[in-house]
């Protein structure tokens, strides 16, 4: 494999040819003959190139001090050795991947050969983190291997080096030379666990002082040391050897002893590492300089290696995509590099070739390599959460090395809406009683029924006790609850009792542990009347603070072991403490049935023709439904795998030899608890892999070492491997899987391939032609895989370890490093002033629990009634506050504004300044709204509840319902008021200020004369709304149906026009829309006067106005139009076809009033002659009766031809032809 890499670095073969050579066995048409010949001889070793490359990069970066959890080295048979080293290991023999440190590599020269034959992962040595204590490598027996970058000793054919000896005096702080009292020295082949402590930094964030490392293999910052393979690292912590149970006490003793030594000596003491070792001392030579692209060495080599590394990642040739991204982020954020000692022998340039010289010679090389890789995977980076994108976009190293990539990341951050919350959901309430299944008819006897009810109560007592005590230090589940759980299991003798209890257990599991949105908790919602006053920005900061305090800080590195976080731990411990075969069997049956039901659930299909925006909006509900189903399936499958493989799990190492063969023969005859292979095949054929694969991964993560060797499960792993190879992220086309769906599958499959029980060489096996990745040809064209059902929130909920990328970048920003024991949480406090005494969160949580318990024991109609009352009373409370408190404040604002106007005089003031002055005085009074709202809800809610509930409701139930309704209504009302009362007061005050200032009219310079009401105006004019109603009554009486005795008096018309003048002159309550409406109504009234269509009260013979009265009213209207209306008056409506057509119904037709009105409009300058001529011309285009059209033409000619007179001399114009015999009427 080294030959391939050297050929690549010498540019004898291209990167594309190497990638094609790795990915497929046949020669591509793109490969030239020279490249094919160079690679054809190494075809048998093709599968070992990728692990060799990964281990090579780990070893080359071993001198870098990374930030955050270290990245494990890669795997199987191929080690990162150069040619001349003994051959690779056999496929069958493997070491336990779960051990924290691999066996020592150089205890003797004879130990090298057995080590090379181990099938375990080859881990390159790496530097220790610099921190207050000793490095991870301290205390390692044997000598370290010399060489630049921490490379291993070469075999035959590699240049030899002079042996180096130590001449330093003994170091009393070396735990290897001077171990703690009572410790057992490790033997070369010891199988008993060592009591010597490999010290790790003790901090509060590490649960039980476990080192924050990847569980799959040791970090790159560890050198080999002895570690017994019998030590079990199973997630439930069974089978720890007795020698390891007092690790905490020995850690405390070691820490005290070290503090004494530091107090006695002025300088820190630490073991002196062997010369040539990359281990730095406490005062070692460390460089801390900013990365500079101009100081990158071997730029061409780095670009080639980065390109082939990126190509392997893009083609899914590496087991875990996000593990490689984490490694790249480590290189990007590396701060220091261990410098070589002056006494180290330097290699001659003649000896160094392209592979022997260090790849990463400085921090500049590491950052350059990382940036080159990240540029190739921008599509993956752009789909990370918004916080990670922000940290990447603000990384100064990215800006320095690749401004283009930094700009693209910033654009992706600005356009991203993927805000991810990792807050764990809170514990929910108990499962309500199920009358359809848990009734007496479903039990064999009364005794069994009562036993079940009793055990149900015991179960919830145990659950409540666990919730109260499980976080207390020193509390143990088995000691506290184990005997009670086993006694409860002993009483469930009947099979039906087990079945009912398992159903309850499963429902409670789903209700407590299911997290559809990934975010839970109601901490911020418990005091909305206070928190909503913070504003959107500060409230968002408080949300982020809550997430940082409640979310788990670390998931155990980029490859955490399968665990049971939060409430899941209760159900795991319950199963272990129960130790009941019957319960486990019923539980497996119930879980299997529920998994098959949910996996076959019909989910909405995606329509590919939808527009992107509309599709995204429409699919929000479908995404939530899919998330609920998927998370439920993952939870159920996790517990099914845990229970199904529990009998086979143990602390002992996996069997080998004949024992393994006999176990395989025996277990191959046992049918699986669930036919997961068939379900997987159906899911792939139906294109529902995004639903099936994630829960299958959870199930397989708890398999023991023998399971992957069984033929049944071997087929499953082969299918998953081929699916992993087919999910190439760069291949996007019509009908292909959505990008985030692929990313989810790659993340869960990559995590599965790092599980210790999965064969190390499985991922790099040669693909046999016999077992093809079969997909049904009649598969649906569009399935769940093609639907955008996965978003970033679901991705991070299913794969929380992806969040380690963000934490790694955050540790770089905050300046933390390995010496701080982990990541630092930099929190900026946000404070606020409380509006009043608020109940504690504990009290509110208790009240909510009591309310839920109360409703569980009552009919559903009671809950609906109480919620209805709370909703309506809360709404009425808000309306009441608007009508009382807000209205009073608006009146105060008007009074204060008038005082301000009088004080400032005619020049007035700035409206914006006036508004701010008024709001600053009145808005603080909005705090009274909360007290008034609580009083209103307490006064109104009980009566509403009593009115709606039945009379036979018990007094205690009625009282509790009233109290709950009061609380809910108060919460709803106060939540709205606290969030909106200030804005509501500002809006109403602003409207009042605008109305008052508008009534004052425009500025004197703009209007030429005063157009508003006078200072002495008392504002007693009729309201515009009332006046509009009265004018409309007259208009409707004139044009609509009426009784013969209905009509209006001339005096009423004059009074109406007088009131119109008063309203127009006193503009206190007149707004532009009302003024426009009044103008239109006045024009309609003038049209009716001209047509003589207004019925007049009086003697039966008199139903029309006298000519003098009509002209007097028209004069009043002309005066109003001329003097009082400030807005435009639609006088063109006078000559509209509808209004002129009113004259057609008059017998005899009299046109004198219309002619008089037109001449007055011209005289007063309200309309021009050209405008009237245009209106009259448009009237000729309408369809009129013949005689009316002739009279209208005569009127037009007369108006345009005759000179204008002050008063018309004719009562009726000569508008008809003589042959029609029309009598002329003279005035």
Curated annotation (Swiss-Prot):
Biased composition (Polar residues): 214-232
Region annotation (Interaction with ASF1A/B) ranges: 188-208
Modified sites of kind Phosphoserine: 265, 285
BP GO terms, sorted: chromatin organization; import into nucleus; protein localization
Tree of life domain: Eukaryota
Cellular location(s): Cytoplasm; Nucleus; Membrane
Compositionally skewed regions (Low complexity) per UniProt: 155-167
Main localisation: cytoplasm
Chain segments carrying region Disordered: 63-294
Record-listed N-acetylalanine modification sites: 2
Tissue expression from the record: Ubiquitously expressed. Isoform 3 is not found in erythroid cells.
Transmembrane residue ranges: 312-332, 626-646
Membrane topology according to the record: Multi-pass membrane protein
Amino acid composition bias (Basic and acidic residues), ranges on this chain: 128-137, 247-260
Keywords: Acetylation, Congenital dyserythropoietic anemia, Cytoplasm, Disease variant, Hereditary hemolytic anemia, Membrane, Nucleus, Phosphoprotein, Transmembrane, Transmembrane helix
Modified residues (Phosphothreonine): 71
Cellular-component GO terms for this entry: cytoplasm; cytosol; endomembrane system; nucleus; plasma membrane
Associated pathology: Anemia, congenital dyserythropoietic, 1A: An autosomal recessive blood disorder characterized by morphological abnormalities of erythroblasts, ineffective erythropoiesis, macrocytic anemia and secondary hemochromatosis. It is occasionally associated with bone abnormalities, especially of the hands and feet (acrodysostosis), nail hypoplasia, and scoliosis.
Complexes and interactors: Found in a cytosolic complex with ASF1A, ASF1B, IPO4 and histones H3.1 and H4.
Biological role stated in the UniProt entry: May act as a negative regulator of ASF1 in chromatin assembly.
Name of this protein: Codanin-1
Source organism per UniProt: Homo sapiens (Human)
Higher taxonomy: Eukaryota, Metazoa, Chordata, Craniata, Vertebrata
